[in-house]
Amino acid sequence: MAKVSELDVQLIAATAFHAPQGVDWEVDEGASESEALVEFAGRACYESFDKPNPRTASNQAYLHHILEVGHDALLEHATATLYIRGLSRSASHELVRHRHFSFSQLSQRFVHSEEAEVVLPKFIAEDEQLTRLTLQAADEARFVYEELLDALESKLEEEPNALLRKKQARQAARAVLPNLTESRIVVTGNYRAWRHFIGARATEQADTEMRQLAVTCLKLLREQSPVLFDDFHITTLADGTEMASSPYA
């Protein structure tokens, strides 16, 4: 029986900020490096390192002002990289439509799908009979995949390059793998792009799996740079899932 995978998202890299020499400006204690960089970039536009406006003197107040007035281009200077596992292949195709991100995704051409897990949609996972039926379909697809793989490798046996032979066989056989096959992907984006993704995909109208991913990303990014994401409000829907919204997204 196919093994079910659960969503797992980890922050693996984020912006490091090094204040330049010769600039009379100090980073607020407690500000993340991403938050410090965004503030520095904004103050660099106007040479306001002396913080002349008391209403935006602190890092938190300055960044909140940036979001309020829509000067979010400054957020493009800070980036975060997340490693996502337990995402269905179908959901990954929605994710890669966000073209301001950079992606490195698990290759079905090079990696044998023998051990690949599956991701069940919420409404299927909640029903024992539907779960059994879906896992049965996944097992049958895996069986056909293995049969095709063996047949294709035999068909390509005259190819002297073993690596090329396996790659050609897998790239053809993967056509029968279902959309619920788990994918793994590294995603890097600037904070403006992450905010756009969360604003678009954490809504009640979004696909359930994508909404779960967006809310999970929000929670991680808010831990890393709380001021840049604390305008998002997370609420629980009637079905027990979560959504997020912001007046600025």
Swiss-Prot record:
Give the binding site residues for dUMP. E94, L95, V96, R97, Q105, L106, S107, Q108, R109, R174, R201
Q: Which residues form the signal peptide?
A: none
Q: Where does FAD bind?
A: R97, H98, R99, Q105, N190, Y191, R192, H196
Q: Is Nucleotidyltransferase found in the keyword set? A: no
User: Which InterPro entries does the record cross-reference, listed alphabetically?
Assistant: Thymidylate_synthase_ThyX, Thymidylate_synthase_ThyX_sf
- Cofactor(s) the record lists: FAD
Taxonomy, superkingdom: Bacteria
Which reaction is catalysed here? dUMP + (6R)-5,10-methylene-5,6,7,8-tetrahydrofolate + NADPH + H(+) = dTMP + (6S)-5,6,7,8-tetrahydrofolate + NADP(+)
Instruction: State the free-text cofactor note.
Output: Binds 4 FAD per tetramer. Each FAD binding site is formed by three monomers.
Its name, as the record gives it, is: Flavin-dependent thymidylate synthase
Organism of this sequence? Corynebacterium aurimucosum (strain ATCC 700975 / DSM 44827 / CIP 107346 / CN-1) (Corynebacterium nigricans)
Q: Which gene encodes it?
A: thyX
